[in-house]
């Protein structure tokens, strides 16, 4: 159990059988009446954000999350097979469980898998990955003055906007959080 007075950004709590992460919190002490804590909570499974108010000192169950590092080994049909690097056990996750950053998964890549009561809540991929460009339009000389971009397909199949000077076969660094080009590797 955790008191509402101890809420901090990132604290995980359990409400109605679901895990919620505190995104924002504000302790309010009105001139008349008792103090309360106004929060914005994000559902760890669905990503929905709701506002909820707690009385000051109210206790709620704290969700205990387990974090383990798994290595992506291969894709089997619609499932992605991960191996626990400590126990060498294999586990399967679907693309829906991994989220929209699944397009950056490359064999041998490590990911942090967060579980609660045996359920996978979230899969955290690295913030940046280095991938090879396998398909893009050739850069035309003189096009770089405007600082334009062009689409490029990388080895995992993801589509990324890259500067005009990038060509097929180059290795580029990509930010997986916002699908942006970070630089050459």
Curated annotation (Swiss-Prot):
Annotated Gene Ontology cellular component terms: cytoplasm
Known pathway: Protein biosynthesis; polypeptide chain elongation
Alphabetical list of CDD domains matching this protein: S1_EF-P_repeat_1, S1_EF-P_repeat_2
Keywords associated with the record: Cytoplasm, Elongation factor, Protein biosynthesis
Compartment(s): Cytoplasm
An example molecular function term from Gene Ontology annotations: translation elongation factor activity
Transcription regulation as UniProt keyword: no
InterPro entries according to UniProt: Elong-fact-P_C, NA-bd_OB-fold, Rib_uL2_dom2, Transl_elong_fac_P/YeiP, Transl_elong_KOW-like, Transl_elong_P/YeiP_cen, Transl_elong_P/YeiP_CS, Transl_elongation_fac_P
One annotated GO biological process: peptide biosynthetic process
Function: Involved in peptide bond synthesis. Stimulates efficient translation and peptide-bond synthesis on native or reconstituted 70S ribosomes in vitro. Probably functions indirectly by altering the affinity of the ribosome for aminoacyl-tRNA, thus increasing their reactivity as acceptors for peptidyl transferase.
HAMAP family in the record: EF_P
Family: Belongs to the elongation factor P family.
NCBIfam families documented for this protein: efp (TIGR00038), PRK00529.1 (NF001810)
Protein name per its UniProtKB record: Elongation factor P
Organism: Synechococcus elongatus (strain ATCC 33912 / PCC 7942 / FACHB-805)
């Amino acid at each position: 159990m955790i008191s509402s007075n101890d809420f901090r950004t990132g604290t995980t709590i359990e409400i109605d059988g679901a895990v919620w992460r505190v995104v924002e919190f504000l302790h309010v002490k009105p001139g008349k009446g008792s103090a309360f804590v106004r929060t914005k909570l994000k559902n760890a499974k669905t990503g929905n954000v709701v506002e909820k108010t707690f009385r000051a000192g109210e206790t709620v169950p704290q969700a205990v999350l387990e974090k383990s590092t798994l290595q992506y080994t291969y894709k089997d049909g619609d499932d992605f097979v991960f191996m626990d690097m400590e126990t060498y056990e294999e586990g399967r996750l679907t693309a829906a469980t991994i989220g929209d950053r699944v397009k950056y998964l490359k064999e041998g890549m490590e990911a942090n898998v967060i579980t609660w009561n045996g359920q996978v809540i979230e899969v955290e991929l690295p913030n940046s990955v280095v991938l090879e460009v396998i398909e893009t339009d050739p850069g035309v000389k003189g096009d770089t003055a405007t600082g334009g971009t062009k689409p490029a397909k990388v080895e995992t199949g993801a589509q990324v906007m890259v500067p005009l000077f990038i060509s097929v076969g180059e290795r580029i660094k990509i930010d997986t959080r916002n699908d942006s080009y970070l630089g050459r590797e």
